[in-house]
Amino acid sequence: MANPFVHVELNTTDLGKAKDFYGKLFDWTLEDVPNVGYTMIKVGEGTGGGMMTHPVPGAPSAWLAYVMVDDVPASTAKAKSLGATILKDTTEIPGVGWFSIFTDPTGAALALFKPKM
């Protein structure tokens, strides 16, 4: 697998404020996913994304890129062995797939994702 970037997401401390700002700024279509506190960003062509309340307590708002991997737990463990700090260990998104979030040795955050097939 080439491990492509597959998703971009805003993890925010104020979801309502972010939706209002980005919806008006880019004229994005925003679609709330019922019962999960997640908003899909529909952009037509290109990579879409989402917005949610930040899953890491106390962390500042930030955009986060997702890279597709074959095995989230194994890739997370490999990242840790190479010096990453795990912020959110492998977590299942029911009906969607699995993800984890880490910072690399320079402090940059990145997420890993494996869709449910």
Give short role names for the model-derived ranges.
Residues M40, Y66, F99-I101:
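Conserved hydrophobic/aromatic beta-strand scaffold that supports enzyme active sites
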Residues S61, A65-K80, T85:
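Mid-chain, well-packed structural core segment of small domains
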Residues Y22:
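Catalytic core of tubulin tyrosine ligase-like
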Residues M1-K19, G46-T47, A62-V67, F113-M117:
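N-terminal beta-strand motif that seeds the catalytic metal site of vicinal oxygen chelate
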Residues D27-A62, A109-K114:
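Conserved short beta-strand elements that form part of the metal-binding/catalytic scaffold
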Residues N3, L10, E31-D32, T76-M117:
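Vicinal oxygen chelate
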